[in-house]
Amino acid sequence: MNQRKLASNSPIDNCLILSGSVASTVKQSQNPLGVPNYRFWLEHRSIQTEVNLERQAWCKIQVILNGNQFSLITQQIKLGDKIRVYGFIHTHKDYNGLSQLVVHAEHIEFIDQEKPNGTLFPSS
């Protein structure tokens, strides 16, 4: 993952690994420069331990993929697929001006053993 630095040379970390189920079909659009954008929703559920207590963790987050390199690969992502997403988080504003946290994916793996090789996007 990318690590950027502040002017003071302190590292700024922004990386996320989240697994879950694909909760929507992949939608495609283009930005004003003609670059394809793909997006879908990922639902995560797990049990986490915090201060020696178990708690249920749940979230639903939009996954964003930008670029031509994802055009064929996104066709493999189906509703209900179990995947692991590697990327960074960012805030998008919706049509009402409300901020929404999203994850920009850089790498996705299928968790389902029926998918060949398990990896959707090779690491660069």
UniProtKB/Swiss-Prot annotation:
InterPro entries: NA-bd_OB-fold (IPR012340), Primosome_PriB/ssb (IPR000424), Prisomal_replication_PriB (IPR023646). GO terms for cellular component: primosome complex. PROSITE patterns: SSB (PS50935). Disulfide bonds: none annotated. The keyword DNA-binding applies. Gene3D superfamilies: Nucleic acid-binding proteins. It comes from the Bacteria. It holds the Pfam family SSB_1. One of its GO terms (biological process) is DNA replication, synthesis of primer. Keywords: DNA replication, DNA-binding, Primosome. Transmembrane segments: none annotated. Residues 12-112 form the SSB domain. GO terms for molecular function: single-stranded DNA binding. The keyword DNA-binding applies. Involved in the restart of stalled replication forks, which reloads the replicative helicase on sites other than the origin of replication; the PriA-PriB pathway is the major replication restart pathway. During primosome assembly it facilitates complex formation between PriA and DnaT on DNA; stabilizes PriA on DNA. Stimulates the DNA unwinding activity of PriA helicase. Homodimer. Interacts with PriA and DnaT. Component of the replication restart primosome. Primosome assembly occurs via a 'hand-off' mechanism. PriA binds to replication forks, subsequently PriB then DnaT bind; DnaT then displaces ssDNA to generate the helicase loading substrate. This is Replication restart protein PriB. It comes from Actinobacillus pleuropneumoniae serotype 5b (strain L20). The gene is priB.
